[in-house]
């Protein structure tokens, strides 16, 4: 069977594969991030979202894989065979788990649409010949689409605001999630 774990989320293994292997943090860092941001929701018996469910499953699979790897490591007498197994797990399965964890943590953190736009932007950037693309890759961020970033040197900015211009009294709009309810 050819199962794509990203299909129901609007992405694909092919789209994720545009990101180089060294882009993804270590499994340990991703697990720590998931625990720090979403522990309550992940441990909750309530259904929060499909991303929470997928994240739970990826974490459980990694735990089982580590149990198996430990057993194999303890029971294989031949060091060369043991090294082959460890390298295979780290190279192949480790990368797949890192990709899954990153995708679902990013979707929960930034929103699925933002992550999908980022993957498409990065895919276009990486496939553009170096001579024709900007030097820096796109960056996944929480900037809203309406934000305008001005380039340096276009028009000089005033150092002080005009006396007629008043600062807004309303607090800045923030994209925030209460830590109490992660769902």
Curated annotation (Swiss-Prot):
The keyword DNA-binding applies. It comes from Hepatitis B virus genotype B1 (isolate Japan/Yamagata-2/1998). Residues 177-183 are annotated as: RNA binding. Sequence repeats lie at residues 155-161, 162-169, 170-177. Homodimerizes, then multimerizes. Interacts with cytosol exposed regions of viral L glycoprotein present in the reticulum-to-Golgi compartment. Interacts with human FLNB. Phosphorylated form interacts with host importin alpha; this interaction depends on the exposure of the NLS, which itself depends upon genome maturation and/or phosphorylation of the capsid protein. Interacts with host NUP153. GO terms for molecular function: DNA binding; RNA binding; structural molecule activity. It comes from the Viruses. One of its GO terms (cellular component) is host cell cytoplasm. This is Capsid protein. Belongs to the orthohepadnavirus core antigen family. Residues 155-177 are annotated as: 3 X 8 AA repeats of S-P-R-R-R-[PR]-S-Q. The gene is C. Residues 149-176 have a biased composition (Basic residues). The modification Phosphoserine is found at residues 155, 162, 170. A motif (Bipartite nuclear localization signal) lies at residues 158-175. SUPFAM superfamilies: Hepatitis B viral capsid (hbcag). It is found in: Virion; Host cytoplasm. Phosphorylated by host SRPK1, SRPK2, and maybe protein kinase C or GAPDH. Phosphorylation is critical for pregenomic RNA packaging. Protein kinase C phosphorylation is stimulated by HBx protein and may play a role in transport of the viral genome to the nucleus at the late step during the viral replication cycle.
